[in-house]
């Protein structure tokens, strides 16, 4: 989905280079985390290897280059984490009150694309983005960044897909229609967010 997002936004992002003296306030960075799962037993030290490595690296890298009081984490306007996306009929709760405005935009974009007939096999009675809060904490790659104050929009279905962590957690159980619909919603969200 991230590669599809980058491909879909490529022309709009490249068009900014053609505008003289154009310095966009926002840019898009795609980060692929690896090593989320524990090797032995889930703990603070045996999990989230990729994000726990990147977080302090970004915190110690001045941004803009040469800055004394700001680092790459300060430049992160929003971390959008996508996880376990691809099973049919997912529902996404809003995990953090501070991300409600962005979650509400996803909810509104989904409804607008539905009204325009651009979402396949989609029902407003079963929307993907349902604005109810989640009552617990899920340990995932957003945690190191959240602890440092980076705003997070966490998109993981609740409940988790039935095939999660089973031998059936494979390509055969990805739902093409759901993925296509979510790609459209996320692309519209990113175009709006980046003012493109």
Model feature map: region roles:
Residues 1-105:
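Acidic/histidine-rich catalytic neighborhood of metal-dependent amide-processing enzymes
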Residues 78, 84-196:
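Active-site-adjacent substrate-binding region
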């Amino acid at each position: 989905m991230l590669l599809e997002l980058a491909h879909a936004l490529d022309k709009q992002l490249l068009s900014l280079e053609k505008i003289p003296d154009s310095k966009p306030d926002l840019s898009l960075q795609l980060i692929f985390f690896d090593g989320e799962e524990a090797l032995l037993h889930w703990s603070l030290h045996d999990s989230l290897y990729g994000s726990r490595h990147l977080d302090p690296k970004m915190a110690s890298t001045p941004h803009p280059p040469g800055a004394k009081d700001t680092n790459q984490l300060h430049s992160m306007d929003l971390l959008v984490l996508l996880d376990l996306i691809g099973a049919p009929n997912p529902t996404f709760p809003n995990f953090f009150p501070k991300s409600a405005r962005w979650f509400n935009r996803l909810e509104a974009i989904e409804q607008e694309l539905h009204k325009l007939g651009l979402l396949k096999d989609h029902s407003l009675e079963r929307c993907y983005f349902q604005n109810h809060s989640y009552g617990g904490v899920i340990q995932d790659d957003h945690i190191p960044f959240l602890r440092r104050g980076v705003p997070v929009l966490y998109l993981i279905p609740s409940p988790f897909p039935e095939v999660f962590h089973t031998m059936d957690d494979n390509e055969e159980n990805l739902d093409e229609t759901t993925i296509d619909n979510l790609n459209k919603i996320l692309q519209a969200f990113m175009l709006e967010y980046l003012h493109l």
